[in-house]
Amino acid sequence: MKNLVLLGGGYGNMRILLRLLPNNFPEDTVITLVDRTPFHSLKTEFYALAAGTSTDKQVRVDFPEHPRLKKVYGEISSIDREEKCVYLEDGTTIPYDDLVIGLGCEDDYHGVPGAEEHTLSIQTIAKSRVTFEKLCGLPPGSIVAIVGAGLSGIELASELRESRSDLQIKLFDRSPRILRAFPEKLSNYVKE
């Protein structure tokens, strides 16, 4: 049997699983999904978790079930492409015939001094929880600065306005307008 190993249970590898399972799964293949957590996280909804308008349960989706789908939970320590093996921090070795790496992204502070130490994040469920707790502890009238006026920044600002209308929310972006990846007409509408 061939072993297709999927590193990461994010959107890309979930799409692969949902396309293959249950009807397009080659008979000679098993799939091993490796992730830190036993569920898929709806990362595009973390802003609502941070703002307190959504719960952990609402941003989690169970991985699909299939007799030839094995789920392994842990941290990846290395990949040996010559030996075709993935190594986990707990010592587990996972051989593969084909490998898909879909491990997601991390916050990028663009070299801004102090940004990592003095900002909060919504990149993971755990970081979104911390952000929520900090926001809950702010007294009325506090200023919340959101760095990044793309979709996540705008969504977070909107949800915060709903859950904490007593806060002053300021958006900062390096672009002269919000939602720079979208048509200017939409950007202007959202700004108003």
Question: How does the language model describe each region?
Answer:
Residues L7-G9, I101, V147-G148:
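Conserved N-terminal Rossmann-fold NAD(P)-binding element of oxidoreductases
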Residues M1, R68-V144:
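FAD-binding core/adjacent interface of flavoenzyme oxidoreductases
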Residues E27, E45, E65, E75, ...:
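Glutamate identity and glutamate-enriched acidic tracts
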Residues G12-P22, E83-T93, I146-G153:
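Short, mixed-charge, low-aromatic patches
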